């Protein structure tokens, strides 16, 4: 059985924190690959202004292109409406019956697990992998695998705010992503 990691998110923008998490879990769990799963509309972010799918996907391609064990999974982008992890993983487990999926989440999402749509059924489809995030614990009533990673306190919301305030984002996200953001005037207001 193949072992594949999945890291979902809006990736608005993708940054070194995402890449660090994916790489650390890849090595810690001896995975074959890590798939980045960009969301169409995450249920917990409905109503928020999100950068276009095309821009987010292009930035994710730029961020992951140098790593042969990173891929992008377009499963959620092909659907309209909110992206529920249960629906996505049900599709993926049917499509790839020979894969054991390890769904990677940060400490913020570990705490939120009891509120996830159809969580009990989802636990039968994937192994959750929790990684620590500053300010959050990994306590949950559900069985999860935990992976310790070096602390790197960066988030997409922090980067959007820094761009809005015209602060430097160098060394926080891949240079090609930074160039794309600046050329396209993303996050300026």
UniProtKB/Swiss-Prot annotation:
NCBIfam families xref list: cyt_tran_rel (TIGR00125), nicotinate (nicotinamide) nucleotide adenylyltransferase (TIGR00482), PRK00071.1-3 (NF000840), PRK00071.1-4 (NF000841)
Key words, A-Z: ATP-binding, NAD, Nucleotide-binding, Nucleotidyltransferase, Pyridine nucleotide biosynthesis, Transferase
Keyword Hydrolase: no
Entry's EC annotation: 2.7.7.18
Pfam families on file: CTP_transf_like
Free-text function comment from the UniProt entry: Catalyzes the reversible adenylation of nicotinate mononucleotide (NaMN) to nicotinic acid adenine dinucleotide (NaAD).
UniProt record similarity statement: Belongs to the NadD family.
Parts forming coiled coils: none
The keyword ATP-binding belongs to this UniProt entry's keyword annotation: yes
Catalytic activity: nicotinate beta-D-ribonucleotide + ATP + H(+) = deamido-NAD(+) + diphosphate
Pathway annotation: Cofactor biosynthesis; NAD(+) biosynthesis; deamido-NAD(+) from nicotinate D-ribonucleotide: step 1/1
Name assigned to this protein: Probable nicotinate-nucleotide adenylyltransferase
MF terms in GO: ATP binding; nicotinate-nucleotide adenylyltransferase activity
InterPro entries named among the record's database cross-references: Cyt_trans-like, NadD/NMNAT, Rossmann-like_a/b/a_fold
Sequence intervals crossing the membrane: none
Domain of life where this protein originates: Bacteria
Gene: nadD
Top enzyme category: transferase
CDD domains tied to this protein: NMNAT (cd02165)
BP terms from Gene Ontology: NAD biosynthetic process
């Amino acid at each position: 059985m193949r072992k594949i990691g999945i890291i979902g998110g809006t990736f608005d923008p993708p940054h070194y924190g995402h890449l660090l998490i994916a790489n650390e879990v890849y090595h810690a769990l001896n995975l074959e690959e890590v798939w980045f799963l960009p969301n169409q509309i995450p249920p917990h972010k409905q109503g928020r202004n999100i950068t276009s799918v095309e821009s987010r996907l292009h930035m994710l391609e730029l961020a992951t292109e140098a790593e042969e064990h990173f891929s992008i999974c377009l499963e959620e982008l092909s659907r309209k409406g909110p992206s529920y992890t249960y629906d996505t993983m049900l599709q993926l487990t049917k499509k790839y019956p020979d894969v054991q999926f390890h769904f990677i989440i940060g400490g913020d999402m570990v705490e939120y697990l009891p509120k996830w749509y159809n969580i009990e059924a989802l636990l039968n489809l994937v192994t959750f992998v929790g990684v620590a995030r500053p300010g959050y614990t990994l306590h949950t009533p559900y069985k999860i695998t935990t992976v310790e990673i070096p602390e790197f306190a960066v988030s997409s919301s922090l980067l959007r705010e820094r761009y809005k305030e015209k602060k430097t984002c160098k060394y926080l996200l891949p240079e090609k992503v930074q160039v794309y953001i600046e050329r396209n005037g993303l996050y300026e207001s």
